[in-house]
Amino acid sequence: MTEQELLSAQTADNAGTDSTERVDAGGMQVAKVLYDFVTEAVLPRVGVDAEKFWSGFAAIARDLTPRNRELLARRDELQMLIDDYHRNNSGTIDQEAYEDFLKEIGYLVEEPEAAEIRTQNVDTEISSTAGPQLVVPILNARFALNAANARWGSLYDALYGTNAIPETDGAEKGKEYNPVRGQKVIEWGREFLDSVVPLDGASHADVEKYNITDGKLAAHIGDSVYRLKNRESYRGFTGNFLDPEAILLETNGLHIELQIDPVHPIGKADKTGLKDIVLESAITTIMDFEDSVAAVDAEDKTLGYSNWFGLNTGELKEEMSKNGRIFTRELNKDRVYIGRNGTELVLHGRSLLFVRNVGHLMQNPSILIDGEEIFEGIMDAVLTTVCAIPGIAPQNKMRNSRKGSIYIVKPKQHGPEEVAFTNELFGRVEDLLDLPRHTLKVGVMDEERRTSVNLDASIMEVADRLAFINTGFLDRTGDEIHTSMEAGAMVRKADMQTAPWKQAYENNNVDAGIQRGLPGKAQIGKGMWAMTELMAEMLEKKIGQPREGANTAWVPSPTGATLHATHYHLVDVFKVQDELRAAGRRDSLRNILTIPTAPNTNWSEEEKKEEMDNNCQSILGYVVRWVEHGVGCSKVPDIHDIDLMEDRATLRISSQMLANWIRHDVVSKEQVLESLERMAVVVDKQNAGDEAYRDMAPNYDASLAFQAAKDLIFEGTKSPSGYTEPILHARRREFKAKN
């Protein structure tokens, strides 16, 4: 059975047990909950006729489904050819012969002629501002609102509440405010100001008063007045210019707001009255329908579409409670200042939003066409677009894009022919909704091996709508393992970080982006910092991403965005990109194609046990939340109780790693099962405080989560590209049906 046949069988099983109430729309059978939302809430708001919409939607689905199937069959065909090659050429790989083979089968394609992308009408957050990017599950309205509002964040809070400030020398966090810790935060903030907006001849640490004189920032120390070294760094203020409430500064296109309030507890203890330093933080945010959510049916998908629609209308709200107080969270308004020339200056109060659709693989029961589930990527393209139309309306004061663009991230594409299919799909959606051509911008995730080695060709397939490329090391590692499953046993998971292909892959993404003209038109992005609690370490290490030429990189939280934003004040990314362009492109292809097989497999029994336990614990800790709680992205304690941000990409690596080691007899199926059972006890203990949690041990056969974990590992060589979605979706739907 091929990988695609395995997936089709699971899809058919799901469709066969369908009991969803449906409405006929354009010849499609649409789940009533989804139909009602789109027809009653969305279409009247965006001025689209319902009959025209549903019939046009059905035409797109019918026309493009065969091509979607062909592309998936092509994945299967290439994988079988590669598997056969490795079986017939075991041992040391002849790199030149291997590359010739990949060209012969069409895995490697000709590089396109020298040309640059032509994208127009992109917002400044993408074209000319370098800064952090959040990724947030769209099914959680609170998370979505917090992320959209994370455009601005308190540096003091981010420092005080994390390990960015050590809890030594009396600086413990504690339950009450600790002035010793607070002072260390203030000192850190002053050093930061000295680094990025220095005064000419003085330190911010010595300033006694800030105000505005002669249209410039004045920093008073005794009887002396000091100005900024770079006078252009001052942008504006609020309040009275002699006693301002806020002062706006800027470096590298990012803003810093000094908030002054001598009555505030923090401001009262500061000689300048400075109560906080607020940083422009999450410049862009991806609202995610993919790896960070568990959306398996019409109810789940409709919730996501509804939240996305509310973000675009500006009307999404969520009632919350904190410390016994109930309040309503809603989207922040824009920020208004008096500019340095005395006129009003308005800055965006919210993060610019992308939406991540699913890839080309999965089908979803929300809509049936001729009795078969619709390809979810086609459904997402149509429905996330129609829900985004209010976000480009000029009359909407809370609109998302000032340039009239809708930004869609398309993940898990294998090579330029699949990117071309996305371009065709987006064009059809624009025609359906009477949107100007190339209104839909695309973010191409460089997270599958066939895209990495054909990145230039993939970019040029969407040359008129490309808004970003981004490395996704986690998924990319999963595909690295699965593609070369038959080549031999892979190095340990931690050693993938230093394997030759990895750095070459990261370099190639930046180099291709620069050579194809992305700077000034599109983002070149890098991946996630997953260790949510280790912010000191993030401050130390993640600055490497802007230094490598990435003008955005992923962060796991608004707090992480604020701290990572400091890096973009310290590094002028666009200058780095100019230097990289001048240096010329690095020759990366040979290294990208260097398969990370282990030179030998003589690990000790303890090392093998450690690798099994780490992966089994990671898999179980994530899968149990996914299958039984519907949580697609969560902080999961690892085997050492360090919280890691886990999503399906991390699951893909761990399951493929173990599948590979079983395949090559590094470990046995029985050893892995024994590790799974021991780690289930560990995960049960880690979740002991959750009343809704169901133990996996000792009744493993009754736990759908445990069974899903087993499937992911033991069926890992058969799962399409090593993807986890088919198994997760099937088990989640089974759990929902039984509960």
Swiss-Prot record:
UniProt temperature dependence: Optimum temperature is 43 degrees Celsius.
GO cellular component terms listed in the entry, alphabetical order: cytosol
Residue numbers of Cysteine sulfenic acid (-SOH) PTMs: C633
UniProt catalytic activity: glyoxylate + acetyl-CoA + H2O = (S)-malate + CoA + H(+)
Pathways involved: Carbohydrate metabolism; glyoxylate cycle; (S)-malate from isocitrate: step 2/2
Ligand binding (Mg(2+)): E447, D475
Single GO term (MF): magnesium ion binding
Active site: R356, D647
Annotated GO biological process: glyoxylate catabolic process; glyoxylate cycle; tricarboxylic acid cycle
Main location: cytoplasm
Induction context: Activated by RamA and repressed by RamB.
Regulation: Inhibited by oxalate, glycolate and ATP.
Compartment(s) of residence: Cytoplasm
Pfam families: MS_C, MS_N, MS_TIM-barrel, MSG_insertion
pH dependence: Optimum pH is 7.6.
EC number: 2.3.3.9
Residue positions binding acetyl-CoA: V135, R142, F143, S292, R329, P556
Biased segments, Polar residues type: 1-18
InterPro entries: Malate_synth_C_sf, Malate_synth_sf, Malate_synthase_TIM, Malate_synthG, MS_C, MS_N, MS_N_TIM-barrel_dom, MSG_insertion
Cofactor info, note text: Mg(2+). Co(2+) or Mn(2+) could partially replace magnesium.
Function (record text): Involved in the glycolate utilization. Catalyzes the condensation and subsequent hydrolysis of acetyl-coenzyme A (acetyl-CoA) and glyoxylate to form malate and CoA.
Subunit structure: Monomer.
Protein name (record): Malate synthase G
Gene designation per UniProt: glcB
